[in-house]
């Protein structure tokens, strides 16, 4: 039988996971995949993150996947971290993200537009379920903002283990600089700490330094 693109990626990820790495770094694992296959890849990553406690860092342009599956998002711009935090925090900065060439999930843009008109308030929506609860009026905004955090065990609950940031970091960058021989700085004064059990998404426009950062994280560049 012929495997789909998503199934092939799932097999490749499983082969890597069999080695039980402490940190798994992926550079656009859903490139050229359709929506269903892309979701399959991120479901696989979340299962590994939750079941094995592996810290996962993934570069991805499909921001809806990052907002749904990651518990921390980093936004790169010209080799520097422009924004970082939980998805709800990062994707609330619609104008700032647009200015540096990064999109927000569509439902988040709709929510922010409605909030600007004074029609809704609370935590920005990141997926269709949250948007439906907020916009339809089935749940009032105050309750929707609480429910948007997703209870433990729900499919959209953050996968970060409790007190993970009290644990010893698995990887730390302290004011890292990197420049290629034929160009300027690809990464500039970048500080980053990764903790056990995190699932971190990295996003940024072309040339922001995403691939360089992943190579630095994996030791392919020094």
PLM segments and residue spans:
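Catalytic Walker B motif of ABC-type/P-loop ATPase nucleotide-binding domains
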Residues: 24-27
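ABC ATPase "signature
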Residues: 84-85
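Conserved ABC ATPase signature
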Residues: 1-3
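Conserved catalytic motifs of ABC-family nucleotide-binding domains
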Residues: 20
């Amino acid at each position: 039988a012929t495997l789909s693109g998503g199934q092939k990626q799932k097999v490749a990820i499983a082969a890597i996971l069999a080695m039980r790495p402490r940190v798994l770094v992926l550079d656009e694992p859903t490139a050229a995949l359709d929506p269903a296959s892309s979701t399959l890849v991120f479901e696989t990553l979340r299962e590994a993150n939750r079941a094995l406690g592996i810290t996962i860092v993934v570069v991805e342009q499909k921001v809806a996947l990052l907002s749904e599956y990651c518990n921390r998002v980093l936004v790169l711009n010209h080799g520097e971290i422009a924004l970082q935090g939980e998805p709800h925090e990062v994707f609330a900065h619609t104008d700032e993200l647009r200015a540096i060439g990064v999109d927000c999930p569509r439902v988040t843009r709709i929510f922010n537009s409605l909030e600007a008109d004074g029609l809704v308030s609370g935590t920005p929506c990141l997926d269709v379920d949250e948007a439906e609860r907020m916009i339809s009026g089935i749940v009032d905004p105050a309750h929707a903002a609480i429910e948007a955090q997703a209870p433990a065990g729900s499919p959209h609950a953050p996968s970060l283990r409790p007190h993970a940031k009290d644990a010893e970091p698995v990887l730390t960058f302290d004011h890292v600089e990197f420049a290629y021989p034929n160009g300027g700085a690809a990464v500039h004064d970048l500080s980053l700490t990764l903790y056990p059990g995190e699932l971190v998404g990295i996003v940024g426009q072309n040339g922001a330094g995403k691939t360089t950062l992943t190579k630095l994280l994996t030791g392919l560049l020094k």
